[in-house]
Amino acid sequence: MMQKLIAQIEKGKPFFEKLSRNIYLRAIRDGFISAMPVILFSSIFLLIAYVPNIFGFKWDKGMEAILMKPYNYTMGLVAFLVAGTTAKSLTDSFNRKLESTNQINFISTMQAAMCGFLFLASDPAKDGGFLSAFMGTKGLLTAFLSAFVTVIVYNFCVKRNITIKMPKEVPPNISQVFKDLIPFSAVIIILYALDLVIRNSFKSNVAEGILKLFEPLFTAADGWIGVTIIFGAFALFWFVGIHGPSIVEPAIAAITYANIEANFKLLQAGEHADKIITSGTQMFIVTFGGTGATLVVPFMFMWMTKSKRNKAIGRASVVPTFFGVNEPILFGAPLVLNPVFFIPFVLAPIVNVWIFKLFVEVLGMNSFSVNLPWTTPGPLGIIMGTGFGLWSFVLAITLIVVDIIIYYPFLKVYDSEILDEEEGRKESNSDLKEKVAANFDTKKADSILAASGVSDDAAKASNITEQTNVLVLCAGGGTSGLLANALNKAAEEYHVPVKAAAGGYGAHMDIMKEYQLIILAPQVASNYEDIKQDTDRLGIKLAKTQGAEYIKLTRDGQAALDFVQQQFEN
């Protein structure tokens, strides 16, 4: 029954993989990633300014204004900045389809998108200048609109050579200025015209009009059915091997960050912060320890199973999963595409958000009002993100208990299956090494096997003799760090000239030329054909990995070095 259900879901995999590679969704996601330092930096000052209130201490008005200035001058302009970063990401995608000698200037598209955004989102101030009410999270949807219109217009002009052409004697930097003039002017004229039409028709700017238009959708998304569909999709997509956040996050990004600010303003006014769909809800409630709400799963594998294999997987996965990097348990157990874990993997995140919604709406707990790094451990993220309230401590404990209850019966079934397999066969030398290597100590693995008189082909000298720089890419930079660290550690142990770095897909365009090999983690393997256009143009090797294969490489540094070597032998 479960196998048939999974088979039906997998039939839609090609469509959803294509959707996850959509250049507009990708531009939104990458635009936010580029702006993340601003978002996280501003949250530090929110915590300093308002967390003391919980303990009865309040800053005076002057000090509060000093602490809030960095927030207002960064997060208060986030939509303005995202207009530029989104335009840059979309420009990179369009440039892949253009000749290398006729590319869109991303600096110009960023400038045009940001200038165009000001027309759509800002109102003139009485004393000169302009107002910034819609330049923060309220203007995010308008930022996307400005970025998309800008790059589409530039692509139209550049592709058809609708530009001012200068004589060959003119220096390239001067020639580029005139080449950008027509598309830049066209963008500003189009967006200014849109601004005039909306202002004269509805007596508001475009940003305010878009916000009113989507307000019913935002309200519906915050309801029981809305949160179930949205956050259930995260786990459902990941279960069949599709990186769910690549599809879902861009669709809800504007809501999540707008709700964070709305909750903060409610708290400032002494009211109840009740917006459910926020970035904190996604990172610390729904993906409590990673997609599938897997924070408790490695501990359960360690302490509640009898299988040696499962205990080893739990030990190897517990630390990264605690910080939200749960690929070791997803692909090591595995949880994804494993019929036994389908129900808890999809159900646990949904139940978590239901419980959170109950705490907020019935018990009066405040929702998230601060943005935190996604690698913050789940329980700590809940407590800090909701203002250190008493209910936040109760909620964190409740989610841990409930998730254990949800996963436990399915874990026992799976553990029984693995026990039967272990009892039916003898452990091979390769199994022994894999378990020792699961502790991330390749040198120790080699010494144990050598002491046992076991030949070890993995310890052979590497054929890599020249300096090789490797870039490992995943969705956000966390999972890629596992393999990059394993490569660097093994390279140092075996004196191999390999240096590896971790990065997030989408933020790689400007640095990839510094590397000889790029490895795609399973999260972003579906983007292989897209990035191959760039690597082929630059003469860089490209490799993609599957789930179990990737986890094995992160645990066995020598195997990871061999994998790198194989890419240059093919």
Swiss-Prot record:
Membrane topology of this protein: Multi-pass membrane protein
Transmembrane portions of the chain: 31-51, 65-85, 104-124, 133-153, 178-198, 223-243, 283-303, 340-360, 382-402
CDD domains associated with the record: PTS_IIB_lactose
GO molecular-function terms, A-Z: kinase activity; protein-N(PI)-phosphohistidine-lactose phosphotransferase system transporter activity
Compartments in which it is found: Cell membrane
InterPro entries reported for this sequence: LacE, PTS_EIIB-like_sf, PTS_EIIB_2/3, PTS_EIIB_3, PTS_EIIC, PTS_EIIC_3, PTS_IIB, PTS_Sugar-EIIC/EIIB
SUPFAM superfamilies in the record: PTS system IIB component-like
GO CC list: plasma membrane
Keywords for this protein: Cell membrane, Kinase, Membrane, Phosphoprotein, Phosphotransferase system, Sugar transport, Transferase, Transmembrane, Transmembrane helix, Transport
Modification Phosphocysteine, positions: 474
Start and end residues of each PTS EIIB type-3 domain: 467-570
Broad class of the protein's primary localization: membrane
Active-site residues (renumbered): 474 (phosphocysteine intermediate)
Gene Ontology BP terms: carbohydrate derivative transport; phosphoenolpyruvate-dependent sugar phosphotransferase system
Coiled-coil annotated spans: none
PANTHER family membership: PERMEASE IIC COMPONENT, PTHR33989
NCBIfam families the UniProt entry points to: lac_pts_IIC (TIGR00394), lacE (TIGR00410), pts-lac (TIGR00853)
Domain remarks: The EIIC type-3 domain forms the PTS system translocation channel and contains the specific substrate-binding site. The PTS EIIB type-3 domain is phosphorylated by phospho-EIIA on a cysteinyl residue. Then, it transfers the phosphoryl group to the sugar substrate concomitantly with the sugar uptake processed by the PTS EIIC type-3 domain.
Protein name per UniProt: PTS system lactose-specific EIICB component
